[in-house]
From Swiss-Prot:
It comes from the Bacteria. InterPro entries: CTDL_fold (IPR016187), Sulfatase_Mod_Factor_Kinase (IPR051043), SUMF_dom (IPR005532), SUMF_sf (IPR042095). Pfam families: FGE-sulfatase. This is Uncharacterized protein YfmG. Signal peptide: none annotated. GO terms for molecular function: formylglycine-generating oxidase activity. It comes from Bacillus subtilis (strain 168).
């Protein structure tokens, strides 16, 4: 049985056994026997840790890398963390380690930031030497080796040394939160790994082939300009590896089984940054209008993330979601280029009345929310129309679906990590598809909705994807993943 076919919980259990063995070994040789201790770490401990395959087990090692009191252990564990970059928690760990008090550790973490061009580290590194545009020609304090290492790392991330080019790129970065996009080229993943992945059988999921597709629309193609549509333009060429996506959205029944698992076993598969004592039971659990085989609603980003990891899956990026909805040809809607109310469940479906104005739409929403005579707001997943070109069902209307993409950058969403105010675009994850309360202007697949990670509106649901494991891609290409659309 290949790794890609193994049940993720059995992988997790095997990895925990490795961690227990490491914990016992790591104290078996005293630190004052320097050569023996280094040999233990370099050979036995690292060999064991490099067998770890589950992201949750890997995050235990990430925690060791940040918090273990021995400097040499933190230094060596960076090699383990690096092989998981750009997985979100590996990126966060490396950035935290750039602030480590020991140069042995912090300098090595900076090397990883430079090699992988970890753009999220720019703000943290800049806090040490201030603005790189000024520091390159007029250094401020501190002025020692550490400051020069930070400056060198930032220059490697920006990829330039000339002052004029640096100013231009830093200005772009300050405005957009990222460097110019690296989405439109093929990552050279070996065909053998792709074929192994594509041959796996994923029950209830549809394989979306890898390759190029067009993300977004041109302005003249926007089907409805009632709402803010400008971040949905223009069309952009994007390359993705293959992935599996759920044919149907996750149901209330399946989600409730997950919450029972959490209540019995604890928050094993939850987001490492989720609030303490997080309650995962959906807020629609208490409303009888939301039936078992209907799409789950009333969940936030942390709920969606935890459910996906509990299933051995992930949240889709907005690129993945949009490709699955629009197909390779980039239809405006999953079924073509014209809105078809018969294929969706939206605000007009509530009372079988077309939406003629913003006023009528708003009135319908408030009426339906208070209308206890409405038997249900959502519908059975098997009764949903509007298949995508790949055969994915119910992507438009019904429920908004969480992605793991950040609104401003389209990169991985890091909730809480950046400690930004909640009116900042950095604090929003992207949602897609519209809901039973939506106006048509909110529902075309390129439309980018947003919300903060702990918002639990009764319109928010989830659909999962399964990807080639990030560390498998890293191993196969023997270097950094440079296409930023992948993670």
């Amino acid at each position: 049985m290949t790794l890609l076919m193994q049940d993720h919980k059995s992988i997790y259990n095997k990895d925990i056994e490795i961690l227990i063995e490491v914990e016992e070994l790591i104290t078996s040789v005293p630190e004052n026997k320097k050569n023996d201790f280094k040999s233990l770490i370099d050979n036995r401990i690292m060999t064991l840790l490099n067998k770890i395959q589950h992201p949750v087990a890997a995050e235990n090692v990430f925690g060791m890398c940040i918090a273990y009191p021995n400097t040499y252990i933190r230094y060596r564990l960076i090699d383990f963390v690096e092989k998981w970059v750009p997985y979100f928690s590996a990126v966060e760990t490396i950035i935290n380690l750039t602030q480590d008090p020991d140069d042995l550790v912090s300098f090595k973490a900076m090397d990883v930031c430079a090699n992988h061009k970890i753009e999220e580290s720019v703000a943290y590194l800049s806090s040490i030497i201030d603005d790189v545009r000024e520091s390159i020609s007029y250094p401020k304090k501190p002025v020692g080796l550490g400051a020069q290492k930070v400056l060198s790392t930032l220059l490697d991330i920006f990829g330039v040394e000339k002052h004029e080019e640096l100013v231009m790129l830093k200005n772009y970065f300050d405005q957009n939160g990222i460097l110019p996009n690296n989405f439109d080229f093929e990552e050279k993943i070996p065909q053998s790994l792709i074929e192994e992945f594509e041959k796996t059988e994923e029950d209830g999921m549809i394989l979306i082939p890898g390759g190029f597709f067009e993300f977004g629309l041109n302005e003249n193609e926007i089907p409805d300009k009632t709402f803010n549509w400008k971040d949905a333009v223009p069309r952009q060429k994007v390359w993705l590896p293959p992935f599996f996506i759920d044919k149907y959205p996750v149901t209330n029944k399946d989600y409730d089984i997950f919450t029972e698992f959490i209540e019995e076993n604890g928050h094993i598969f939850c987001h490492p940054n989720e609030p303490q004592n997080k309650q995962h039971r959906r807020n629609t659990y208490w409303d009888d209008r939301y039936l078992d085989n209907h799409p789950v609603t009333g969940i936030d980003f942390y709920d969606a993330f935890a459910y996906a990891r509990y299933k051995g899956k992930e949240l889709p990026t907005e690129f993945q979601w949009e490709k699955a909805a629009r197909g390779e040809k980039g239809n405006v809607w999953p079924w073509g280029d014209k809105f078809d109310p018969a294929k969706v469940q939206y605000a007009g479906s509530l009372y079988n009345e077309p939406i003629t104005s913003l006023k009528s739409w708003r009135e319908n929403l408030l009426k339906a929310h208070a209308d206890k005579e409405l038997n249900h707001l959502t519908s059975d997943i098997f009764e949903q129309n509007g298949e995508s070109p790949y055969g994915v069902c119910g992507m438009i209307g019904g429920t908004w679906e969480w992605t793991r993409s950040e609104l401003k950058t389209k990169r991985a969403f890091h909730p809480i990590f950046e400690n930004v105010p909640f009116n900042s675009v950095n604090s929003f994850a992207v949602l897609k598809g519209g809901s039973f309360f939506s106006h048509p202007g909110l529902m075309f697949p390129s439309f980018r909705a947003k919300d903060i990670p702990f918002c639990r509106h009764n319109e928010m649901g989830i659909r999962c994807v399964k990807n080639i494991p990030v560390y498998k891609i890293r191993e196969s290409i023997n270097g950094p993943i440079t296409n930023k659309a992948i993670y």
